[in-house]
Amino acid sequence: VFVQCVGSRCDGVEKGKPYCSKICCMYTAKHAMLCREKYPDTDVYVFYIDVRTPGKNFDEFYRRAVEQYGVHYIKGMVGKVTPENGKLKVQASDLLDNRQLHIDADMVVLAAAIEPDKSARPLATMLTASMDTNDFFTEAHPKLRPVESPTAGVFLSGMCQGPKDIPETVAQASAAAAKVIGLLCKDSLTCNPCVAQP
């Protein structure tokens, strides 16, 4: 049993995060297919709120998990997981069929919320870089300067800016590296001098 959105997309929940972790749907589909490949007699269930497949061919990948691999996607919430006789008893609700489910599982896999590292806030203070309300670094402009922070000379890539998959992170890192090379190739740099106050 795979459980999606554990601790993410939880507005108003004390310990939850309001944002989508963005990569969980595809990684869960991949691991569900790998599980069915390795153990073909296994029933694999995925409980989800919404399946988000925003990238190229991602929707086809998700449909392949359902149609070719026989992964059971159930729109609903897991209410309780209880260990019993060497198994995990999963109590859940199927929102589309309006029924309660009880599944005996060997394993329950949680797709937990992605959180920024705790050291991000002190680093932002040291670099005078800005952060959003979720403690991710913010870019200077989302369309025009997506890898630059508002602080000159500070560039962003990867999950420091928000949840991203590997290809998006690599593309962003390449863009940040190009910006750094452009900065270092200049004959001279102009910067604002910092003066210590007595």
Q: Where on the chain are the PLM-derived regions?
A:
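Residues forming the flavin
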Residues: 1-198
